[in-house]
Amino acid sequence: MINVLVFPCGSEIGLEVHNALKYDKHINLVGLSSVSSHGRVVYKNYIEGISFITSDTFMEELNKIIEDNNIDVLIPAYDDVILYLSEHRDELKCKLATSNKTTCDIARSKRKTYEVLQGEWYIPEAFKVSQITEKDLPLFAKPDIGQGSQGIMRIEKMEDLNLLKGKDDEYIISELLPGQEYTVDCFT
């Protein structure tokens, strides 16, 4: 039996991991959350109340939970947690099911992802605020670090750019890609 800890278990990723692994007779799933979440309803084994990753005591608390529950593998289930744990992998008292720190860092930043994939046909053209002219519109702006469509903005006219002046480092401004958006999450 493999003891697998999912944190945070109430995130969309955490719930998907549960759905993917809940019937595997070789896996004992344990859900962990800092706050009360839907994970409480879904996970048979649920632990609540660990500090946030920004706390100085987080790693100590996490390792105690890992040891107390004989955890073999930790699956991080939120973007910031994935990056944080990849940076602290050597401190963990169990295996971590995620990519290396460099890959996690690139994946967390849209700008870094665009830089790595620059020149590929499927990457939209990106702009700096100072380079944009009327003929470039409409455009699309999104935070470099973010998820769930939070902070996105469609730029229809030059005046819309006033909100983004001085924020070239915080936002990615790209050509607007029309049509349906599809998101694919996969855990196998």
Where in this protein do the model-derived segments appear?
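Flexible loop residues that form catalytic
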Residues: 52, 79, 131, 144, ...
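Hydrophobic anchor at the start of a short beta-strand
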Residues: 29-30, 123-124, 171
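Phosphate-binding site of ATP-dependent enzymes
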Residues: 154-188
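A conserved helix-loop-beta module that forms one wall/lid of the active-site cleft
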Residues: 87-153
